[in-house]
Amino acid sequence: MIEVWAPRVERVRLRRPGLDDVAMVAAGDGWWRADVALADGDEYGFVLGEGDDLRPDPRSRRQPHGVHEASAWFDAASFSWTDVAWTGRQLAGGLIYELHLGTFTPEGTLDAAIARFDHLIDIGVTHIELLPVNAFNGTHNW
């Protein structure tokens, strides 16, 4: 089951690359639902109204191609955790860097940001706080 809140449209479709669009069903209070199972990594998005533009999932946990592109389904339960003994890092005395993924690199992706983490370590950063990754009005989502 996948849901999206789109209160001001008369029609919502779920779009996945290489597959036919799936008409979503109005579920009340602006919510739309589709009884579709997505596997970890499946790309998808929504088409609102009579348009044809793909919109990312505003509740997505993964945007591999940037905030304006298709979302990718993330199944946290399928991940095999191997670090149960890790206790985290001490916050006291740490240096926190507030990172906005959309502007930290030209690509605006987490993968591109990770490639620059060594620089943050070199300047003394001990913790990274991701700024909100959900969409806001404007070009850069702020």
Where on the chain are the PLM-derived regions?
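Short, solvent-exposed loop/turn segments at secondary-structure junctions
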Residues: 9, 101-104, 135-136
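Residues that line or immediately flank small-molecule/substrate-binding pockets and catalytic motifs
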Residues: 16, 103, 132
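Short beta-strand elements bearing conserved aromatic residues within extracellular beta-rich modules
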Residues: 12-14, 44
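Amphipathic, non-transmembrane alpha-helical secondary structure
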Residues: 111-121
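Short proline/glycine-enriched turn/loop motifs at strand-loop junctions of beta-rich domains
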Residues: 5-12, 19, 39
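Aromatic-lined carbohydrate-binding/catalytic grooves of carbohydrate-active enzymes
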Residues: 120-142
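The feature marks proteins involved in alpha-glucan
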Residues: 1, 21, 27-98, 103-108, ...
